[in-house]
Amino acid sequence: MKMVFHSVLVAIGIAFLFGNFANAESGKPHRVVIQVDQNDADVMNLALNNARNLLDYYRDKHEDVDVEIVAYGPGLHMLRDDTSPVKDRIRELAAVSFPSKVVFSACNNTKQGMEKREGHPITIIPQATIVPAGVVRIMELEEQGYSYVKP
């Protein structure tokens, strides 16, 4: 009798586990691109709050979400190693996002323009990837089904 009860509990646990994953995988994937184009710490923090809230919401539902924050124009300061007012929060968010993911993309057009104006190379934080053009990256992500958010 104990063995039957144990087997039933294991079966229920497996059904619950696979039921949640099947539900998450059978639906539309959750993907969001967040635009940051202002050198404003409040806007940058709001973008990071949006990303964190998305991670927490879908984690509670046992679902994954992919978030990409694209910074260009004056917003590139968010991802500059020398001027970012939020680089500690970015490091923290990147560390806690698994199994979902938060990706940070820095516009190379903006980076090159800033380097030309400032007369020296600009270092981007290690959590960010340089993309050719921020606006193009946003457009391509939307074409792939990402939802668009501008804080």
Predicted regions and their residues:
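Bacterial N-terminal signal peptides
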Residues: 7-19
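Secreted/extracellular ectodomain signature
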Residues: 22-151
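Positively charged n-region of N-terminal signal peptides that target proteins for export
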Residues: 1-6
